[in-house]
Regions:
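Extracytoplasmic/periplasm-facing segments of secreted or lipoprotein envelope proteins
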Residues: 170
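Active-site catalytic pocket residues across diverse enzymes, especially alpha/beta-hydrolases
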Residues: 29-30, 197, 201
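N-terminal Rossmann-like FAD-binding beta1-loop-alpha1 element of flavoenzymes
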Residues: 10-35
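Flavin-dependent oxidoreductases
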Residues: 199-200, 214-245
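Secondary-structure boundary motif
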Residues: 28-32, 131, 253
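Single conserved hydrophobic/aromatic residue that forms the stacking wall/gate
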Residues: 246, 251-255
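Glycine-rich, N-terminal phosphate-binding loop of Rossmann-like dinucleotide-binding domains
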Residues: 15, 187-188
Length: 255
């Protein structure tokens, strides 16, 4: 099957924090070395951030290194953590406060961290990437990898405008090849392209299987008098193994 082909120097699959940070770093190196390598990011969501549902307690060390002037550029890190709380839940009515020994549990110390929407952060990263010359294409899925001479040469996008019955709609667009000298897969946990790479090169041979945990996210509306901006709480005990709670700037803006 003949397909249209677009070629880049760097192709990043997935516009999450890792993929966008990768594209930004490549673009910064372009500027530093006075080069003009083409960089493309594709994202399956209708827009950057569309598939990023999580809030986040964000540790900014990596961002300080990548974009030192992020405050001047108005990165959406506007809720600094003000208080950490650790509690053991006995049941639905009783909890026991646990002193916070930062030396023994440094991950429970969020001083200097920020509460934020990860989707908004990705949108901000996308704007930064585009300002550096990165091309970002949202709404494009990557259906398969292109392997030639045992090297990853790019990806094939999925067809667009196909009905549930497999019929081509008036908006149909055929798949195309995106080829690059360097292809970076940033599609997240258990991505289907990653599975293809693992199978092709037997990367899991004689390896222990990966382990995964299931987490559930809930957004709670609480009474304004109970809302304490910048609070992070870790729990253990009832009803399962524990949870992480944090307050947004207001009860409804952690989209």
């Amino acid at each position: 099957m003949e397909r249209d082909v677009m070629e880049y120097d760097v192709l990043v699959v997935g516009a999450g924090p890792a993929g966008l940070s990768t594209a930004i770093k490549f673009a910064q190196l372009n500027k530093k070395n006075n080069t003009n390598h083409s960089i493309c990011v594709i994202e399956k969501g209708s827009e950057v951030g569309a598939h990023i549902l999580s809030g986040n307690v964000f540790e900014p060390t990596a961002l300080n290194e990548l974009i030192p002037d992020w405050k001047d550029k108005e990165a959406p890190l506007d809720t600094p953590v003000k208080k950490d709380i650790v509690k053991y839940l006995v049941n639905e009515n009783i909890s026991i406060p646990v002193p916070l020994p930062g030396f023994f549990m440094p991950n429970f110390n969020n001083h200097g961290n920020y509460i934020m929407s990860l989707a908004n952060f990705c949108r901000w990263l996308a704007k930064e990437a585009e300002s550096l010359g990165v091309e970002i294409f949202a709404g494009f899925t990557a259906s398969e990898i292109i392997i030639e001479n045992d090297q990853l040469k790019g990806i094939v996008t999925g067809e667009m405008g196909v009905s549930k019955d497999g019929e081509k709609k008036p908006s149909y667009q055929p798949s195309m090849e995106l080829r690059a000298k360097y292809t970076v897969l940033s599609e997240g946990c258990r991505g289907h392209l990653g599975k293809q790479i693992i199978k092709k090169f037997n990367l899991d041979q004689d390896k222990d299987p990966q382990h995964y945990g299931i987490g559930f996210k809930e957004i709670w509306d609480i009474k304004p008098k109970l809302h304490k901006e910048g609070t992070v709480m870790h729990t253990a005990g009832w009803p399962a193994k524990g949870c992480l709670l944090y307050t947004s700037p207001s009860p409804r803006d952690m989209s």
